[in-house]
Each structure stands twice: as structure tokens, then as C-alpha cells.
Amino acid sequence: MKTKKLIWMLAAILVICGACVMTCCNSDEDSVVSPTDDSSQFVTLTDAVPDAILEIRYYGTYNFVGTRIDGYEEPTALLTKQAADSLKAVSDDVMAQGYRLKIYDAYRPQKGVDHFVRWAEDLNDTLMKPYFYPDLDKSVLFPQEYICLKSGHTRGSTLDLTLFDMATEKELDMGGTFDWFGPESHPDFCGDPETGEYTGDNSKSPAEPKRSITAEQFEHRMILRRAMLAHGFNPLDTEWWHFTLKDEPFPDTYFTFPVKQLK
């Protein structure tokens, strides 16, 4: 009887551990259960936000994989109607401050996420390591949740973006590139995002000498953050560029249709 009880206990532990692995994800990427290819509730982002600038990194080759990502058939961006409406309010807000929104990614089909997973499993493919994860061994990308099996982007109300300065005609200097894998991308790196106070605390940087960002670069991140939060988006605690609509319409659905102009 003791042996049988022990076997049942071990089986239960394995099930729990397996579930933890399968749901590895960032804080805004809850478990989703319903796949669909229905794009009827989506809009082309630039139709809703005509002042936005697009630089769809996963359509090109300058990204952490180094090739075009599966599912990105055209260099466009799609969002749910609700997220696009809120983003228009963000755009109007930052335009009044002299900035435009620059979009790196929005809706991401599940096949794009699957592409990331295959890439992460190939530890020999480190082509883009010098540009996006020079301080990390590729083997930690799964354990540290830089790459996960599911993404909030597949739900259609998440996007990655920065600010473009209309006076200088350049991106605002955020002190780090989009998709940089490391603590330097965290909103609380060198400051407190809740108060907007710059502290200069770079102790989490794994580099030697440690990387840092300036007070001005931290404030640039805060300008974007304040505008997004003011219009209904939630931030992610590991990426300064990543936001999800708080009241997203499809919290339990992930979409599979490709990224291309909607008809």
C-alpha cells in the first residue's frame, strides 16, 4: 500500500511540474485555450492610428532570430478594434507632446510564437546574440521566460512600441534596443516606474562592467509608460516596450491567422 501511495504522489508531482513548464510565460500571458483564425474583430493598426510609424521587426531579418518570422506575410500591424481605439487616444496624447508612436509588433499569430520556440531549442543558432542577448547564454531563454510557448500577442490586444521625436526625426533614446534580453529592459532598471524617480541602480545588469541608462533615457521610457497607462494599457515588468489592453476583449483566445492587410 505504501508503494502504491508513493507512486500516486510522484505522479501528482510530475503532473504539477509539467503544468508549470507548459504555462511558462510572462505576467500578462495567461493560459489561453481557444484557437481561431477569425480576424473579423481586428483592424489594420494604421487605419485606426494613421500617425503611427511601422517598423515590423519580425517581417524583416533584424530581430533576435535573424530571419523573417513565420506568419508575417506583410509588413503591417493588426490589433483588436478595442485596442486600436485606445491606442488612438495614446497617439493623440503623445502627438501633443511632440512624439509619434513607432510600432515594432502588435498581433502575433501562434505560428510566429512556435517559430520562436523552435529557434530557442536550437542552442547552436546564436547568429544574433551580439545584438540582442550578448550577456546571456541561449540555454537560459526558456528558464528565464524570455521565450514561452504562448504569448499575449496572439490574443490581439498587445503591442510593442516606442516613441519617435518629431523635432529630431529620430526615435527617442530609451537606453536599449527593442527585444534586448536582459534586466536592462525592465521598466524598473535604474529607477522606480511607479513614481518615475531615477535611481541609477544598475545592480541587476549581468554585464561587466555593468550596463546603465541615464536619467534622460529613463524619463523617455516613463513618457511612453505614462501615456499607455493613462489610456487603458497594462505594462509588463520585464519589457519597457510591451503593453496589453487592460480590458482586452479576448483574454481566453489565441488567434492563428497571418499578419497581412485585412480585406
Predicted regions and their residues:
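Bacterial Sec-dependent N-terminal signal peptides
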Residues: M1-V33
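Extracytoplasmic cell-surface/polysaccharide-interacting catalytic and binding patches
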Residues: C25-A106, Q110-T238, E248-K263
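Conserved metal-phosphate-binding beta-hairpin within the catalytic cores
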Residues: F243
